[in-house]
Amino acid sequence: MDSFHPTPGKPTTATSNSSLNFFVRNREKSIRCSSLHQTFTAPSPEASPSIGLRYVNYSMSDETDESMFPLDSELTDMEDDDTEYISDSTTDLPSAAMARGTRQLSYNENLDQRSFSKTPNKHIEVKNLKDLCSPSHSGRISKSLCPVLRRKSLLPKPKMFQRVASALYEESSPLELEIRSESEFSKMFFEPKKSSSFVSRAASPAMVGPGVPFYSSITGANGNVLAPSGSLKAVENSDVIESSAEDSSNTDNPSTKPSNEMPISPLLSSSVFFKDTEMSTPNSNHSRSRTPSSKKRTRWGEEIIDLSKRRAVSPSIYYDLDKKCSPIHSVMVSPLKIKDTHEVLMNLKL
């Protein structure tokens, strides 16, 4: 029997067709699977340039239905603030762009309308700085400003400017500021001499102008330092000091008058104890020749009686009223008798 031997390199048609169909079918299947995978996972068309996107539409609707197609994200959004649309045509701009242009124009016009100084490096006195920083007479800023500059948080704050101006003024004249503060302190605490009762109102530091030196305004013709005007009222209110001043002027000579006498506070001179001692003592030459400092010493001794009423003293601390006390600090010289709190608590126990 003759057997059929196919020639090598030339396969039969049945086997060749079946193998070719197998490879072609598998190749189409792999292409379909890869394209389907790319439609769901590829982020952009650039990821697979060789194969175009195939959109799978599962709906049975018309082919014109674009519900499954994605939106075109490459189109520029006209309402976006970052991108500005530039029209190629010669038509007018939209109203929003016109409003933006007019706003910029109004801002530039307002810059031109403001009165800036021609010489910015001009020397400005510190005293005129408060007038420059103070607000206008109307107290309102003109409404011609654009809405951005009309915002309240961006407006100039005049109080802050005035604080800075006052701080600069204090730095420029520290000596004058210190003298004025000391004069206000002496108003409250010190009593004037007799010659100050005839001083006019111009001697008060409040009436002195800024250009007038303060020392020349408070010194009299004889070179004596005059007291401020606030303490003159204390002399008018206290009759005791006026009577003692008249007595001392009649008896004592100004040349023999001691120069280092302690000034009496007007607050203490109007106290009840000082007037009671003056009324109770007889009008003798010895009482007239006493200086205010000696009256102050006696008054300290009598005022210590009511010291426990004025101060909040613990009941466990007590002292004898017969003991002497120092007139300067009003503190008892003798050691205080202090009860031990432990003993008090032991006595309170039942």
UniProtKB/Swiss-Prot annotation:
Give residue spans, biased composition: Basic residues: 287-298
List the GO terms this entry assigns under cellular component, sorted alphabetically.
nucleus; site of double-strand break
Its domain of life? Eukaryota
Polar residues compositional bias, start-end: 10-21, 246-259
UniProt keywords (A-Z) are: Nucleus
Using the UniProt record, give the first listed, main subcellular location.
nucleus
Give the UniProt subcellular location, in the record's own words.
Nucleus
Renumbered to this chain, region (Disordered) spans 1-21, 237-266, 278-298
Protein's name according to its UniProt entry:
Uncharacterized protein C16C6.04
Source species of the chain: Schizosaccharomyces pombe (strain 972 / ATCC 24843)
Q: List the taxonomic lineage.
A: Eukaryota, Fungi, Dikarya, Ascomycota, Taphrinomycotina
